Amino acid sequence: MIKPPLKKRRFFTIYKTTKFIKITTYKIVIIIKEEYPLPPSLVKLKEERDSQIRQVITGESNKFLVIIGPCSADNEDSVCDYVNRLAKVNEKVKDKLILIPRIYTNKPRTTGEGYKGIVHQPDPEKKPDFLAGLIAMRKMHIRAIEETGLTAAD
């Protein structure tokens, strides 16, 4: 069976059960992962980084974790420029530190009206579009890993 393009699929049906909303949201995430997959080479890299991080947390490694980044990431080019610069620093300190770029895609202090970040509104000039925001967020994270080899915290 051929799946319709992502934009043509119907995702949200409003019911009064939280369980249905959770299942629908889960399906959206699975579909986005299928439509925008992480290439096998990046999956391997992510697994290696996750293992290094786990070793620090469990005390198997003497390195320190440093999660570093801006309050909110809402411009893909700027974020990737920042992560590229951080990757250069990472090369200098990788024997003692594991640098994890923070790519936070919400605006944590924005409530009510206003721009809430790329995940809610990928284009600040247009209406909010959560699905497009999830896609933009995934693309930004994949690009950052591809360009730098650094996996991020969100």
Predicted features along the sequence, with ranges:
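Positively charged N-terminal leader segments that act as targeting/secretion signals
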Residues: M1-F12
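N- or domain-start disorder-to-order transition segments that initiate the globular core
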Residues: Y15-E60
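N-terminal beta-rich core of secreted/periplasmic extracellular enzymes
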Residues: L42-K44, E48-I53, V89-I100, M137
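Generic secondary-structure signature for well-ordered alpha-helical cores
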Residues: S51, T58, N84-D95, I142-L150
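Conserved, mostly hydrophobic/aromatic
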Residues: G69
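Glycine-rich anion/phosphate-binding loops
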Residues: A73-V93, K127-K139
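Active-site-facing alpha/beta catalytic cores
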Residues: K96-D154
